[in-house]
């Protein structure tokens, strides 16, 4: 389990680093409003990744509960972005998907041989 927790921590850290870098780039290239929309989505994605990790941790238990709360998080973010005039929908959505960058990073790190992995 220690290896799983280390992986979970790494994924959260990489997601957070990507969030900070992309937030700065969006703020520089667009506006603070767009960057704030991105940041809201990215924080939602970070929370989603954490919830997903907790769900994976519970695999094998007898409880059969589907990811309703994770889906609800995504729906609330999108509805909030669509209804609130200060938020932009696309940056919120793309911000939410930022956690995928950490998953891609991990996959590439696992597949591409390096001096550490050899």
Swiss-Prot record:
Keywords, alphabetical: Cell membrane, CF(0), Hydrogen ion transport, Ion transport, Membrane, Transmembrane, Transmembrane helix, Transport
GO cellular component: plasma membrane; proton-transporting ATP synthase complex
Protein localization: Cell membrane
UniProt xrefs under InterPro entries: CGL160/ATPI_dom
GO biological process, one term: proton transmembrane transport
Membrane topology qualifier: Multi-pass membrane protein
Spans traversing the lipid bilayer: 11-31, 73-93, 94-114
Family: Belongs to the bacterial AtpI family.
Protein name from the UniProt record: ATP synthase protein I
Organism in which the protein naturally occurs: Synechococcus sp. (strain ATCC 27144 / PCC 6301 / SAUG 1402/1) (Anacystis nidulans)
Organism taxonomic ancestry: Bacteria, Bacillati, Cyanobacteriota, Cyanophyceae, Synechococcales
Underlying gene: atpI
């Amino acid at each position: 389990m220690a290896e799983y927790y280390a992986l979970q921590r790494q994924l959260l850290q990489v997601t957070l680093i990507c969030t900070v870098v992309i937030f700065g780039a969006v703020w520089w290239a667009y506006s603070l409003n767009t960057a704030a929309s991105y940041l809201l989505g990215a924080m939602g994605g970070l929370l989603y990744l954490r919830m997903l990790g907790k769900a994976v941790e519970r695999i094998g238990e007898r409880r059969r509960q589907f990811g309703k709360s994770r889906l609800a998080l995504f729906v609330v973010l999108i509805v909030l972005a669509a209804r609130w005039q200060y938020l932009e929908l696309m940056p919120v959505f793309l911000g939410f998907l930022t956690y995928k960058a950490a998953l891609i990073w991990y996959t590439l790190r696992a597949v591409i041989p390096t001096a550490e992995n050899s």
